[in-house]
A protein has these predicted regions:
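PAS-family sensory domain signal
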Residues: 21-76, 170-178
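Regulatory hinge/linker segments at domain boundaries
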Residues: 170-195
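Short alpha-helical "packing" element that flanks the helix-turn-helix/winged-helix DNA-binding module
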Residues: 194-201, 240
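Short, low-complexity N-terminal regulatory "tails/caps" that precede and couple sensory modules
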Residues: 1-22
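Sensory/regulatory domains in signal-transduction proteins
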Residues: 46-69, 74-162
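A cross-family signal for key residues in well-ordered alpha-helices
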Residues: 92, 199, 212, 230, ...
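Intrinsically disordered, low-complexity basic tails/linkers immediately adjacent to helix-turn-helix/homeobox/MYB/SANT
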Residues: 243-250
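Recognition helix of helix-turn-helix DNA-binding domains
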Residues: 204-239
Length: 250
């Protein structure tokens, strides 16, 4: 049987004294509320030392019909209540693999890394939602352990759960978790014309109008689309836009 403690069997956080909590408590709530007001994503803050959620935004996507207070009080039990059992096991494997990866990174560099993956949440009496979930360290202990981490959730552009990636904000590399092992891949790069095509598409322009704006033919714009679909491993322009935004390519 999976329990909340299953998420922490391979990771122990060094002690965080009360005075450290006193330092951050005065501004964390204000900062998180301000951040929540600027994004369409659901956000929450994990405390790995106390094994709880410190903050949960009021975006309804992630709440499964609960209040932010309810989700905050549930903490990691939220996953056990609202994620399919087979994917609960996947989340635990991701948790363990993520911590194993981060141990290989120098403490001062750990803030730069983000793990991303997709899983289902099951709101009562509704169809399951496939969400993309990202976790980024926010504060470390004096010994370099991850103390607080920012989590974001949004609708996933994938077709199934999984697709586990680790990225670093200072380089174009990415690592994918495959059969329990991290495998390095080159990151996705778009040309300036491909990025412009996506931005103008987001702005509502048709292929013909994008062609006029970029001084290219409509067939050339269509070729940009095909290249983007291949690079991002998607099947249509909506998925391409979501993936490009998700990967911070536009």
């Amino acid at each position: 049987m999976i329990k909340k403690e299953s998420f922490f069997t391979e990771y122990r956080v060094s002690a965080v004294p009360d005075e450290e909590y006193a330092k951050v408590s005065s501004y964390i709530d204000h900062f998180m509320r301000a951040f929540a007001n600027t994004t369409y994503k659901s956000i929450y803050l994990i405390d790995y030392y106390k094994k709880t959620f410190l903050y949960v935004s009021d975006n309804p996507l992630f709440l499964c019909g609960l209040s932010p207070k309810d989700v905050k009080e549930l903490g990691f039990d939220f996953y056990l209540n609202y994620v399919p059992y087979v994917e609960q096991k996947m989340l635990i494997e991701i948790n363990h693999a993520g911590f194993q990866f981060i141990r290989t990174v120098e403490p001062e560099e750990r803030y730069k890394y983000t793990i991303s993956y997709s899983f289902h949440i099951c709101p009562p009496h509704k169809e399951p939602l496939l969400i993309n979930h990202k976790v980024t360290p926010v504060l470390l202990t004096t010994k370099g352990d991850i103390w607080l981490a920012l989590c974001t959730a949004q609708l996933s552009s994938e077709s199934a759960s999984g697709h586990i990636e680790m990225t670093c904000q200072t380089n174009n590399k990415l690592w994918r978790l495959e059969s329990g092992l991290w495998k390095e891949y080159p990151g996705v790069e778009l040309t300036e014309n491909e990025r412009s095509m996506l931005r103008l598409t987001v702005g509502g322009l048709s292929i013909e109008k994008i062609a006029d704006r970029l001084l290219r033919s409509a067939e050339t714009i269509k070729s940009y689309r095909r290249f983007v679909f291949k690079k991002l491993e998607v099947g249509n322009i909506t998925e391409a836009i979501m993936m490009a935004i998700n990967k911070k390519l536009i």
